[in-house]
């Protein structure tokens, strides 16, 4: 089995791990009602996706 020739320092290990983080989901304003919703998803408040009503809301 392959073994590293040198020990990885704490700094190098931590610098490599700086990119391991959670990403915030892309939010956009609904063109119909103006509420925030996830991009490319049906709006939970009005039920529209683009110009069409996909889900009936009360």
From Swiss-Prot:
One of its GO terms (cellular component) is large ribosomal subunit. Belongs to the bacterial ribosomal protein bL32 family. One of its GO terms (biological process) is translation. The keyword Cytoplasm does not apply. This is Large ribosomal subunit protein bL32. Transmembrane segments: none annotated. Pfam families: Ribosomal_L32p. InterPro entries: Ribosomal_bL32 (IPR002677), Ribosomal_bL32_bact (IPR044957), Ribosomal_zn-bd (IPR011332). The gene is rpmF. GO terms for molecular function: structural constituent of ribosome. The keyword Ribosomal protein applies. It comes from the Bacteria. Keywords: Ribonucleoprotein, Ribosomal protein.
